[in-house]
């Protein structure tokens, strides 16, 4: 066996040789050990030395007694580094899209997966309301929970729109999303399986700068 800190170096070497390695990390929390070589070399290699180092990182999140560092999603660790794209597919077609996108490009792809999504066979569509009370922007596994929350809120007479977040980085705040947020009564909430002080806060801040509403965050 090898240490987690060594595996990142192996895949970086493979990426530099054009192998396009798929790196499976069993628990996202272990990215604290697996990520240093990737984010400090592979992610920067293309921009600094004009030598791409494409790596497809399958980073798997899980819940339930996994320990203080092993559980939940940790995609925020990769967000601040240039040259890294972050995507969080939760459906079969989304995952197929993620892989095909990676094969067309030469960037580092951090694929934030979640074990709970593996049994899912259905696609997830956005839900729009005219003048909603609130707009939910769920990421990762919170997308399924957002659907359940929407149904419960509707029973209470609260209209909640849902705009599913597939791409984390680059984040594109589309005009349709902006109109939906601006037409809401109370603003939006970014839901994430990671800590609030990371991807969720960054996306919420971006939305507030480009809209007229407040956007809150919840780390679930």
Model-derived regions: residue spans:
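Conserved thiamine diphosphate
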Residues: 2-6, 12-137, 143-145, 160, ...
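Thiamine diphosphate
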Residues: 4-7, 50, 114-220
């Amino acid at each position: 066996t090898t240490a987690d800190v060594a595996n990142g170096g192996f895949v970086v070497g493979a990426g530099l040789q054009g192998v396009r390695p798929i790196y499976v990390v069993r628990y996202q929390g272990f990215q604290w050990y697996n990520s240093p070589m990737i984010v400090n070399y592979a992610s920067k290699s293309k921009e600094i030395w004009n030598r791409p180092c494409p790596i497809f990182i399958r980073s798997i999140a899980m819940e339930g007694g996994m320990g203080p560092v092993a559980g939940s999603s940790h995609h925020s660790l990769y967000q601040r580094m240039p040259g890294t794209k972050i995507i969080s597919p939760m459906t079969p077609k989304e995952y197929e899209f993620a892989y095909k996108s990676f094969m067309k490009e030469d960037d580092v792809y951090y694929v934030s997966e979640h074990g709970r999504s593996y049994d899912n066979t259905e696609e997830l569509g956005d839900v729009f309301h005219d003048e909603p009370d609130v707009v939910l922007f769920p990421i990762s596994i919170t997308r399924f929970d957002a659907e359940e929350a929407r149904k419960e809120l509707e029973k209470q007479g609260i209209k909640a729109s849902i705009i599913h977040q597939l791409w984390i980085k680059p984040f594109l705040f589309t005009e349709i999303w902006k109109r939906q947020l601006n037409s809401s009564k109370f603003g939006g909430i970014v839901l994430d399986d990671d800590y609030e002080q990371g991807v969720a806060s960054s996306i919420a801040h971006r939305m507030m700068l480009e809209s007229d509403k407040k956007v809150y965050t919840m780390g679930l």
